[in-house]
Swiss-Prot record:
Subunit structure and binding partners: Homotetramer.
Enzyme Commission no: 1.14.14.5
Name assigned to this protein: Alkanesulfonate monooxygenase
Source species, domain of life: Bacteria
GO CC annotation, single: alkanesulfonate monooxygenase complex
Extra information: FMNH(2) which is absolutely required for this enzymatic reaction, is provided by SsuE.
Function according to Swiss-Prot or TrEMBL: Involved in desulfonation of aliphatic sulfonates.
Protein's UniProt keywords contain Oxidoreductase: yes
GO MF entry, a single one: alkanesulfonate monooxygenase activity
InterPro entries: Alkanesulphonate_mOase_FMN-dep, Luciferase-like_dom, Luciferase-like_sf, SsuD_RutA_monooxygenase
pH dependence per the UniProt record: Optimum pH is 9.1.
GO biological process, alphabetically ordered: alkanesulfonate catabolic process; cellular response to sulfur starvation; protein homotetramerization; response to heat
Pfam families for the chain: Bac_luciferase
Organism (species): Escherichia coli (strain K12)
Length: 381
């Protein structure tokens, strides 16, 4: 099985160390462009662009990277409860058309009540997943060119439709990650690829089996991916030294503040990440070559594969043997580490190198009539 390898655009900051200004660098458009172009040339399938108040807007960043890349895909967040499904469907179709079919979408429900309240969302955990399920139903139907009437608990639309279709049919692929039962049920019923954070293989296997069984109950098969950091060097000793350097400027106060912030979220996945290290620096190798140091201060993906090329490749193949075909990777700083992974790791793996997509011809069309329909040629009698 060929593996799809993704990289990450650090729109929330980048540098040599975690939790400090020491060794940080400006993250401007030029720097993000360097990372995107490096990923494009090295053969990564795409890049994940993060979302939330700590990041630059993912959609604008993705759009700005389209003309400076050739084959790289952009995994961009859909935000149920923050954006209406009708607007999100139009945005998705536009991004897919502008990129010639290089758009992918990541369903993000949110987990921090404080941040969600700032965005005007006052739903609890279960309600957010209800809203996300309704959002996804409407979004998918619109991209399949249906005119949609929907009267749900959270989403209400009447006569919703999409005039300009996406390139990818029936709709651009939909990614999603969540560890709770309700999240897994949503994934099983509606998404194309289920993402998990980098837990030890035995825990990942358990998740995959649960989601696969739930999907089968809906008569569906879905793909699987994993989100991990990578610290790969020419030797194992060098890799572990780099891991220790990454957190060498962290103090206990910063760790405690970060863990307190994570504790207020209602994300089951974040709780599982925190439980891997319990906010402590000791015993951070939680599984062979799987290191939890990143999660001391970083929300979301908090583990890294650490080692030389053959060692990290072997660990990746262990996850692949569980059924994972997509690996969303990152490393600090992201420009240099994109090259290290591409040069030290890719030659040891069966990496699916994407081709440059051929331009997709679009049907000629006149201006929309009354903002309601696209004019068609009238048959001559």
């Amino acid at each position: 099985m060929s593996l799809n390898m993704f990289w990450f655009l650090p729109t929330h900051g980048d540098g040599h160390y975690l939790g400090t200004e020491e060794g940080s660098r400006p993250v401007d458009h030029g720097y993000l462009q360097q990372i995107a172009q490096a990923a494009d040339r090295l053969g990564y399938t795409g890049v994940l662009i993060p979302t939330g108040r700590s990041c630059e807007d993912a959609w604008l960043v993705a759009a700005s990277m389209i003309p400076v890349t050739q084959r790289l895909k952009f995994l961009v967040a859909l935000r149920p409860s923050v954006t209406s499904p009708t607007v999100a469907a139009r945005q998705a179709a536009t991004l897919d058309r502008l990129s010639n079919g290089r758009a992918l979408f990541n369903l993000v429900t949110g987990s921090d009540p404080q941040e969600l309240a700032g965005d005007g969302v006052f739903l609890d955990h279960s309600e957010r997943y209800e809203a996300s399920a309704e959002f996804t139903q409407v979004w998918r139907r619109l991209l399949q060119r249906e005119t949609v009437d929907f009267n749900g608990k959270h989403i209400h639309v009447r006569g919703a439709k999409l005039l300009f279709p996406a390139i990818q049919q029936p709709y651009p692929p939909l990614y999603f990650g969540g560890s709770s039962d309700v999240a897994q049920e949503l994934a099983a019923e509606q998404v194309d690829l289920y993402l998990t954070w980098g837990e030890p293989p035995e825990l990942v296997k358990e998740k995959i089996e649960q989601v696969r069984a739930k999907a089968a109950a809906h008569g569906r098969k879905i793909r699987f991916g994993i989100r991990l950091h990578v610290i790969v060097r020419e030797t194992n000793d060098e890799a572990w030294q780099a891991a220790e350097r990454l957190i060498s400027h962290l103090d206990d106060e910063t760790i405690a503040k970060a863990q307190a912030a994570f504790a207020r979220t209602d994300s089951v996945g974040q709780q599982r990440m925190a439980a891997l290290h319990n906010g402590k620096r000791d015993n951070l190798e939680i599984s062979p070559n799987l290191w939890a140091g990143v999660g001391l201060v970083r929300g979301g993906a908090g583990t890294a594969l650490v080692g030389d090329g053959p060692t990290v490749a072997a660990r990746i193949n262990e996850y692949a043997a569980l059924g994972i075909d997509s690996f969303v990777l990152s490393g600090y700083p992201h420009l240099e580490e994109a090259y290290r992974v591409g040069e030290l790791l890719f030659p040891l793996l069966d990496v699916a190198i994407p081709e440059i997509p051929q331009p997709q011809p679009l049907n000629p069309q006149g201006e929309a009539v009354a903002n309601d329909f696209i004019p068609r040629k009238v048959a001559q009698s």
